């Protein structure tokens, strides 16, 4: 009986501690870590491909870049 009472008390303390903890870290706003200005500037071509695009993006402070050909980008070098 004493073990059950101790176990229930410990369980209630854990539940109470978890409910009183600050969980705002999980609900915090996601903010971009890099630059957020126009990320698709240069047009890609036969001479300006993924390699040059990635190099230019790294020089501009982005982590990477590649040529995107889908309709909203229109064959531009987009940095990420």
UniProtKB/Swiss-Prot annotation:
It comes from Arabidopsis thaliana. Residues 1-27 form the signal peptide. Disulfide bonds join 40-79, 44-67, 53-77, 57-78. Belongs to the DEFL family. InterPro entries: Defensin-like_dom (IPR056373). Pfam families: Defensin. It is found in: Secreted. GO terms for cellular component: extracellular region. Keywords: Antimicrobial, Disulfide bond, Fungicide, Plant defense, Secreted, Signal. The keyword Lipoprotein does not apply. This is Defensin-like protein 44. Its main location: secreted. GO terms for biological process: defense response to fungus; killing of cells of another organism.
